[in-house]
Amino acid sequence: MCGQSGSTSFAFLSMPMSARLNSLGGNNVSVDNGELSTALCNPAVLSDKTHMSLQLNYAYCMSGINAASAIYSHNYKENRFAAAIHYLDYGKMQYADEYGNKSGLTFGARDMLIDLIYSRQLGPMFRVGAALKPIYSIYESYSSFALGADVGAHFQTKDSTFQLGLSLQNIGWQLKKFYDGPESGNRSMLPLNLQLGFNYRFKHAPIRIGMTIHSMQRWNLGYELSGKSTYVLGSKKGMTSEEWALAQDNGAVMWYDMMFRHTIFFLDIVPRSEKFYITLSYNHRHRAELAIKDQRSLAGFALGAGLNIKMVRLGFAFSQYTKGQYIYQASLALDINSLMK
């Protein structure tokens, strides 16, 4: 659900926290259109467009998992500030022994995050930003605390037709492990994510297209599963179809497949007035890792829509992670500055 983080902890940090982020493929570091939640991926996106904005987000995920967040922003001269709180509840789970026998008793699991965001305008077209993120998780009676940070930069032309963003997310590690016993191992790192994104808005058509390149700090996005590790092949020349099928079963991935697993593509239909938007995106990593072989699904695709009605923004998004498992998200944003006038 939260992205495939491999050996790191706090994988929920990879989950899109709003309908807009979900519709953009789960992550976006370049789009600046007054949507407050995009600053959660790149703190430099926080701009004067979001002054005194309050945004509430809710997500219903697979298997009864619920997530909610609230974000508020305020500007002071050339400085932009925002604070967000996120809560993820995995619901009730049953105790079971090592053989899978359930006792009938249940326990809960929750993740919580506070996001303190700052950005500063360094000219008419360039901003930088940073965020500090205390993180707390409790699973049954085991708890963990971590501290993370994000840094980012954002550029856009004066007419906003072209936007470029760069962000390094989740710099940090656990300060308190879930378990401090002799076999608990070292403190885990957070799921680091170096991203570069851009988008272009056509001058004479209500269309914006863009791409995000994520996880740039790591070429091989595979992980070990059932004793098999993902490995990248430069060529399958000379291999029969049976040999290639066997190699795939053992974790082989072609280089161009791995390259596209680093990309997210999106298409925005949005008029100049920005009174509404319709967004379609494709995340190849989600599809490659979560789609079930030989079965049709929309894994990797996300669809979203939003309305901007005077002082209120509404957003809705839908994505399928695997067959029968969906995420539905809704967002409500209020322009408090306009409401008080």
Name each model-derived stretch:
Residues C2-K341:
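Subset of outer-membrane beta-barrel
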